[in-house]
Each structure stands twice: as C-alpha cells, then as structure tokens.
Amino acid sequence: MTETGVIGCGCRGVTGGNFFHPGGFSLKSCFLEQSTKRNRNFFRSVSMIPPFKRGRFITKLRSVAGNSRIFSMDAREKSRSFVLVSSRHKRVPVFVMMPIDTFGIDASGCPKIKRLKALTVSLKALKLAGVHGIAVEVWWGIVERFSPLEFKWSLYEELFRLISEAGLKLHVALCFHSNMHLFGGKGGISLPLWIREIGDVNKDIYYRDKSGFSNNDYLTLGVDQLPLFGGRTAVQCYEDFMLSFSTKFEPYLGNVIEEISIGLGPSGELRYPAHPSGDGRWKFPGIGEFQCHDKYMMEDLMAVASQEGKPQWGSRDPPNTGCYNSFPSGVPFFEEGNDSFLSDYGRFFLEWYSGKLICHADAILAKAADVLRRRQEEEKSSVMLVAKIGGIYWWYKTSSHPAELTAGYYNTSLRDGYDPVASVLSRHGAALNIPCLDMADSEIPEKYLCSPEGLRRQIHDVSKKWTIHVTGRNTSERFDEMGLRQIRENCVQPNGDTLRSFTFCRMNEKIFRVENWNNFVPFIRQMSADM
C-alpha cells in the first residue's frame, strides 16, 4: 500500500491544514459546539443518550470507505450477497477451539503437538456430538520460529490431516502475537526467536506504556511500515506468512478450511494491550493505560501534531489519565472538564490513537483479502475472512467509555467507535468476530457500569449498516445450562438473523466431564438445528 500523510498506510492523512483521522474525521470540522450547555451526570447510562447528539457536541461522521484508495466494491458486493444468502437459514455452525496448551517446545527447542492420542479421541467425540469444526491457532512463533522466511509447516500438516480425517472443518486463526503471558512467561508460544533477538536490541519494536514497561506479545503499530526486520516491514512479514500459508494449504482452502481469522493485535484482537493482566499490572475493572510510548509511535504523534500546527501536542499522551487500575471517577481526562477527552487536544489524541489502529487493520486485511482473492479468481471455493475485536464492556455505561479508549476504540457517548472498524472490514469483505456471547448485564456488578449487552447491540447495528457477517465467541468458560442457553440466544441477532458461526473457547478436559458433556451435547445439537 502507498504511504500518504504521516500515518504509514493507504488511508487519507493530512489535508489542507486540518488533521484527518484515517476514517476522514477532521478535528476542525468534526465537532460543532452547541450554545446551550447542560449539566450531565457523568455516570448516566449511554442508552438514555440519543446517539450522535449527546451533550455539548454534535458529531459529523464521514465513512472510512469513502476516503480509501483501496476500496473494493467487488468485496462489498460479495459480502452483501453472502450475508443475504446466509441469513435464510437459522443454523449456527460451532467450531471448538483447540486446547490452550496444544503445542509445546521439546528439549531441542522445536515445537511439537502434545498428547496426540488423547487429541485424536477427543476429535472423534466432538464429531459424534455434532460439532461442525475445530478452531486452530497457527502461530507465527512456531512456523517461522528460527529464521526469517524459513517456514516449517509440518506440525500443522499433521494436525490438519488429523482434523480432516475426523470429518471436521477448520477455522484457522493466523496468530502474530504471543501467549506467553498466559503461562507466567514459563511456557506458551513466543514471537519468532529472530524477532525476539531484534527486540533484545531494540525494545521499541514493542508497545510501551507511560512508565516505560514494554509488552512483547505483539509488535507495535509504529513499525508496520518500517523495514526493521531483515529489510522487511512488519506488514511485509505478516504478508509473507499469509502467502506461505495459502500456498502450503491450498488444497484445504474452501474445502476443509472454511474460515481464516487474521491476527491484528494482542490475543489476535484489533486493539492495544491496554489491560495487561498476565504480569499483574492490570486487574478488572481498571480503565487501563494508553500504549503509545515506544519511540516510533511518539515520532509519528509528533509529526502529526506539527502538521496540525500544534507541535506541543506531540510531546506526550494526555495528562491526568490515571493508571491501569483506576476507576474513571476522579480521573480528569475521562470526565468532562477543560482537559478531558472532550477538549481539542483530547479529540486530537484519540483520533490519532484510534486512527493508527484502523490503518493497521486496513493494511493487513488488504494483504489477506488479496491472497484469498487470488484463490477465488482461480475458481477455488470461497473462504470467509474474519477479524476479531476485543470485548471491552466495563465502564460502557459512562460518557467517556475509558476502558475502550485506552484499548483504541474511540467510542464514547458522542461517537460510534465501531463504525470505522466495520467500514474497513466491509471494504475487504471480512466478517467481524465479537466476544461476550456468554455474558449478560445482570451477571456483572452494577457498580462497574458494564454492559456486554449494549456493546453487542452497538456492534450488531454497525455490522448491519456495513452489511458484514458477524461471528461470535464466548469470553469466559461456560458449561452450565444457563450459560450455554445464553450463548444460543445471543447467536440470534436483533433482526432475527443468526450469526454466521460460533467459536467455543475452548477444548479441555472439563468439557468431557459427564456433568458438562451432558449440557454441551444438547447445546451443540440445538445450534445445529433451525433456531
């Protein structure tokens, strides 16, 4: 993709002295101040505030798609046609995610599949129960582990063959992140070793918080377009991986492999690592912290601020934003004062911060869609491209939605932060995978002003607007009858359509316990019938 402006992607950058978010939001024209000021309770429910006309400002949102040079009407039309056809049925295929410890590292440092015999038996049991397919994480840190451009697929060839022989389909998750934080740093899958060697010398290839702590689970967006990896940019590394995958598993595409989700951030989700629970820095329901203090992100911020004519805005992220475990009450930036998220600087920073995330998704999904499009042009069976977003549902009922802001979703009572995300997915013909299908507002303490239900409704609305598929997953482990019933009910969208598919997270020994299996099997069969 070509680079324009100061943000390294094919989105529109700076035009005519105004700073533009990649989605086309001008800081100087985006908001009009109303003459009437109202005193509002900071903690009132968003559902009571009319959308896009809440309080002091009126937003004028312009579509991301309208500004993109890579917009593909073919992808949009294909997506729309696909949604209309799929909505005629009411069945939801269920994929079960592989165990979190499926892969291990042997004494020689090479990856291996653990408990292969037990896995074979488990796959047969899931097939008999009516499960449609298996979701498999394909790790960058396994396949391209030792040297750049040396892809070793033998482990996945064995696993895919095993799943196919069991009569199951595949959802493949291409993972460009690490999950070592889930194992306390003493296990799991890291980023490729050659990437880590670069990171040992240059820690700024990773996200960094305001205290200087780095997060080596995923490369910072700041290096997306910088040739720091043996002459390749991060986006080129991701593209080469996807090309190698599609070449190796071409016979499976559209046949056994039905869905491919593209990793776009920590845990494969399009977001910043603003809530790092693995190392103890963050605990629910903290608001999190902005993750833009590596030198590459800060250099970009300074360049954008200078072009906006406000160089002083580029020297730091917003002050008075609290810390990881702060509550929004008493944190000035997330309230409504002069230095809040409503200020000129607050809007500037949030446009830039969220805009970098949108450009990141745009660049990678463009590469992924191009790879799959080549297969479709060769009259291969179609594969659904999928992108995951995080389920940041706490403090959702506040005006500022602080936990979403730190994660990179510029979603407030004044602005729909998921609309530009859905727009990017729409132009690339990708489906949106949403979390929290197992959750209800009534199950969460009211004092944290959570609303997984409100979040789901908002995402369903933008998905309908942009005519994209919606798939889903659970956030917490549920085997109880009520939790499974809740998932089933949430797989039916407000307009009566069903989700395209559901991924159950995840397979482990608990699922096969008699008391859980007796709930799980009826759940699978109900999902496989007309709902």
UniProtKB/Swiss-Prot annotation:
User: According to its UniProt record, where is this protein mainly located?
Assistant: plastid
Where is it located?
Plastid, Chloroplast
User: What is the reported phenotype of gene knockout?
Assistant: Slightly retarded growth rate and reduced starch breakdown in leaves during the night.
Record GO cellular component, one term: chloroplast
Query: Where expressed (tissue)?
Result: Preferentially expressed in vascular tissue of cotyledons, leaves, petioles, stems, petals, siliques and roots, particularly in phloem. Also present in root tip.
User: What does the function comment of this entry state?
Assistant: No alpha-1,4-glucan hydrolase activity, including beta-amylase, alpha-amylase, a-glucosidase or alpha-amyloglucosidase. However, facilitates or regulates starch breakdown, especially at night, by a mechanism involving direct interaction with starch or other alpha-1,4-glucan.
Family listed: Belongs to the glycosyl hydrolase 14 family.
Question: What is the protein name stated in its UniProt record?
Answer: Inactive beta-amylase 4, chloroplastic
State the organism named in the record.
Arabidopsis thaliana (Mouse-ear cress)
